[in-house]
Amino acid sequence: MSEQVAKRFIEALDKLEGGRDLEGIVGLFAADAEVGNVVSPEKFRGREGAREFWGAKYRDTFGEVRSTFRNVFAAEGRAALEWATEGTANDGTPVRYDGVSILEIEGEEIKRFHAYFDAGSLGRQLTGKAQAQDG
């Protein structure tokens, strides 16, 4: 079951990134889900929290964005997804970062989602400071 939920998550993320279909990904989360990442100390709770996280905190951060998955590991009630995300900031600046997302799954729903990545690097790219510091 966990492998199928992970696959549906990847498909829904693709639709969110490519077509801004927010409801597809929100529908995968449990009513009492917890959603977050290393950038935000705030945890987003429930489906409304998932909607805010995946809309305002994720998709709206980018102009264009696309994630690819290198490894997907799923076991009973858990999945780990290794990914790379590329796209542009809203001002057109290129963005690339990679990380790992952990999904805790109950039945056919995601109970908890947390993503781990280099938040400093992503922040510099989104604010256009990466080239100044890297160069």
Task: Describe the predicted segments one by one.
Residues 22-77:
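A solvent-exposed, acidic/Ser-Thr-rich amphipathic alpha-helical stretch
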